[in-house]
Curated annotation (Swiss-Prot):
Keywords: Cytoplasm, Fatty acid biosynthesis, Fatty acid metabolism, Isomerase, Lipid biosynthesis, Lipid metabolism, Lyase. Gene3D superfamilies: Hotdog Thioesterase. One of its GO terms (cellular component) is cytoplasm. Pfam families: FabA. Signal peptide: none annotated. This is 3-hydroxydecanoyl-[acyl-carrier-protein] dehydratase. InterPro entries: FabA, FabA_FabZ, HotDog_dom_sf.
Length: 171
């Protein structure tokens, strides 16, 4: 599939099935762990560092699986799922930019939570700015990101790191 500047849910599902970047290359999670419904924009030279930018969205539906179990009587989307979504997007960016291998989260420098995602929300927006993209034996991306709910920033992450690995058996 040729790289595009935006992707639908159907495209993202194909990525999860390994049909976007080729067999053995970057995949998004499938089913319930895919934390976005669309990528509205992805660029190779956007963002304040000129290294790339990604914007994606998740439509909130009160019937989403995590609201039933986190927490009973006090439903809130787990913050770790928003963090994972940002890692998913850094990995997607690396595959989109031609990187070979399977993505693995390598860490994050700092995370701040200043709000929550409730079942009454309408939309979550993820915004990532690539700070560094290493294209050597190891493909690795470093990005800063935010999670917004209905236009308000509620999570901030600095130095999200994802690498692509040809062999994950020793990881």
């Amino acid at each position: 599939m040729e790289p595009k500047n935006s992707y639908t849910k159907e495209d993202l599902i194909l990525c999860g099935e390994g049909k976007m970047f080729g067999e053995g290359n970057c995949r998004l999670p499938s089913d319930n762990m895919l934390m976005m419904d669309r990528i509205t924009s992805i660029t190779a030279d956007g963002g304040i560092h000129g290294k790339g930018e990604i914007v994606a969205e998740l439509d909130i539906d009160p019937s989403l699986w995590f609201f039933d179990c986190h927490f009973k009587g006090d439903p809130v989307m787990p913050g770790c799922l928003g963090l994972d979504a940002m890692w998913q997007l850094v990995g997607f960016y690396l595959g989109w930019s031609g990187g070979p291998g399977l993505g693995r989260a390598l860490g994050v420098g700092e995370v701040k939570f200043t709000g929550q995602i409730l079942p009454t929300a309408k939309k979550v927006t993820y915004r990532l700015v690539m700070k560094r993209v290493i294209k050597r034996k190891l493909f690795m991306g470093v990005a800063d990101g935010t999670v917004e709910v209905d236009g308000r920033v509620i999570y901030e992450a600095k130095d999200l790191k994802v690498g692509l690995f040809q062999d994950t058996s020793a990881f």
